Amino acid sequence: MEPLVAELKQKIEDTLCPFGFEVYPFQVAWYNALLPPAFHLPLPGPTLAFLVLSTPAMFDQALKPFLQSHHLQPLTDPVDQCVAYHLGRVRESLPELQIEVIADYEVHPNRRPKILAQTAAHVAGAAYYYQRQDVESDPWGTQHIAGVCIHPRFGGWFAIRGVVLLRGTEVPNLPPTKPVDCVPTRADRISLLERFNFHWRDWTYRDAVTPQERYSEEQKAYFSTPPAQRLALLGLLQPSEEPSSPSQELHITTLLSKKPQNPRRGWLSPTVSPPISPGP
């Protein structure tokens, strides 16, 4: 790795890693090479970028402390706000650089994603992006099959949070890092893609490899709740709002305590199709 890249990576890691994030460098050219022009990042090919993902530890190391602080005004989505806060700290830690942060959920006015997060994760070597084209003679006929990223250490128990673009910082000699192909057989790839596309609510696709760490039951309950109901789940409704279900009456102290998750929490029924990307 080039000395400049190693130095910047270390600075970003010092800012993010204590809070359950990982960072991976890549060149914009590697990303653009895999996509049609409409999805290209409008930067010179050698521009340095970093892929940022969250590990299972982020929930305890970043989100809970964030909720205990005074950063939540006004309330929208606690996880997105927490991630935005920490990515903003990256910009503050490197004031001499031109830094642009693109979150995984950002879109252009025409609703086209600003970043295809799974492609970025693949070219950065963070996680292998398994797609239908990776299965020889696939069995799905005319069915639409979405792809999914698998991390070599966390399986599917992680989330891609965004990219950090360093405008004006070019690293033409940065060598590419291939992602680890941790689901190498045809049968296992078929199983992975079917679990993700048809049974994604049961979490099993995330165990495509034996993970070092999984989401806690507390995290699973949070991420299984519709976004519109998550504030109520955390006890963060405005005083004038009323919870619409018993599961929404749980106070934030439940989330912030070290006690086991309340077993009465409900679960969503499976929906027809998986999310566009394998979050959260």
Curated annotation (Swiss-Prot):
Chief site of localization: cytoplasm
GO terms of molecular function: cobalamin binding; cyanocobalamin reductase (cyanide-eliminating) (NADP+) activity; demethylase activity; FAD binding; glutathione binding; oxidoreductase activity; transferase activity
Catalytic activity: 2 cob(II)alamin-[cyanocobalamin reductase] + 2 hydrogen cyanide + NADP(+) = 2 cyanocob(III)alamin + 2 apo-[cyanocobalamin reductase] + NADPH + H(+); apo-[alkylcobalamin reductase] + an R-cob(III)alamin + glutathione = cob(I)alamin-[alkylcobalamin reductase] + an S-substituted glutathione + H(+); apo-[alkylcobalamin reductase] + methylcob(III)alamin + glutathione = S-methyl glutathione + cob(I)alamin-[alkylcobalamin reductase] + H(+); apo-[alkylcobalamin reductase] + adenosylcob(III)alamin + glutathione = S-adenosylglutathione + cob(I)alamin-[alkylcobalamin reductase] + H(+)
Keywords linked to the UniProt accession: Cobalamin, Cobalt, Cytoplasm, FAD, Flavoprotein, FMN, NADP, Oxidoreductase, Phosphoprotein, Transferase
Binding site for substrate: 104, 115-118, 129-131, 149, 160
UniProt cofactor(s): FAD; FMN
GO CC field: cytoplasm; cytosol
Chain positions with Phosphoserine modification: 245, 247, 273, 277
Biological processes annotated in GO: cobalamin metabolic process; demethylation; glutathione metabolic process
Location relative to the cell: Cytoplasm, Cytosol
EC number: 2.5.1.151, 1.16.1.6
Record note on cofactor: Can utilize both FAD and FMN.
InterPro entries: MMACHC (IPR032037)
Keyword Transferase in record: yes
Residues annotated as signal peptide: none
Quaternary structure annotation from Swiss-Prot or TrEMBL: Monomer in the absence of bound substrate. Homodimer; dimerization is triggered by binding to FMN or adenosylcobalamin. Interacts with LMBRD1 and ABCD4; the interaction ensures the transport of cobalamin from the lysosome to the cytoplasm. Forms a multiprotein complex with MMADHC, MTR and MTRR; the interaction with MTR could modulate MMACHC-dependent processing of cobalamin. Heterodimer with MMADHC; the interaction might play a role in the regulation of the balance between AdoCbl and MeCbl synthesis.
Function text: Cobalamin (vitamin B12) cytosolic chaperone that catalyzes the reductive decyanation of cyanocob(III)alamin (cyanocobalamin, CNCbl) to yield cob(II)alamin and cyanide, using FAD or FMN as cofactors and NADPH as cosubstrate. Cyanocobalamin constitutes the inactive form of vitamin B12 introduced from the diet, and is converted into the active cofactors methylcobalamin (MeCbl) involved in methionine biosynthesis, and 5'-deoxyadenosylcobalamin (AdoCbl) involved in the TCA cycle.
Sequence similarity: Belongs to the MMACHC family.
Protein name: Cyanocobalamin reductase / alkylcobalamin dealkylase
